Amino acid sequence: MRVVSEEALSRHLAALRPTMPRVVAGGNGATPWTVLRLVDDALPAYRLFVLNAAPGLPERDGVVLETPFIGAGMRGRPGLEYLPCRLSLVPAMLRTSTPPDVVLVTTSPPRNGTVSLGTEVNVLPAAIEAVHSRGGLVIAEVNRAMPYTFGDAVIDMGDPEGAPDIETQLLFED
């Protein structure tokens, strides 16, 4: 992963293919709102897959919401595509029928060359693995308030040098 500016990330997203990419984002209390706003500004159309989404997701033509677990941010939304699936089977779904092109996560600040998904681990490690297998993108929004947790939450980001201590920082991996 490398640190990028919002402008550089927006340019990269605008060049993304296919024309209707699937974006998987962290849900619950760990939605990467800054990165999600950039994705929404850069992509005219995309599928947004979120578990237990909070209110505030993009509401416009061209955005198709997908989820196997409908949270407050998706209830009653027109065009919502409910994907019936047990939570334990979501990783298999991400590998097969709903593979991601982009994964958006909120992470802790870097520590010894790694970041942590903190409180939002559930299906994100599987989403990251699936997007890596397809040559897709992982975009992390670093938040100082996200705790560093261990186990499957830990992501190797390479050399952490040059990662300034700021409120929100964007990391990009392609």
Please describe what each predicted stretch is.
Residues 1-174:
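Conserved alpha/beta enzyme-core scaffold
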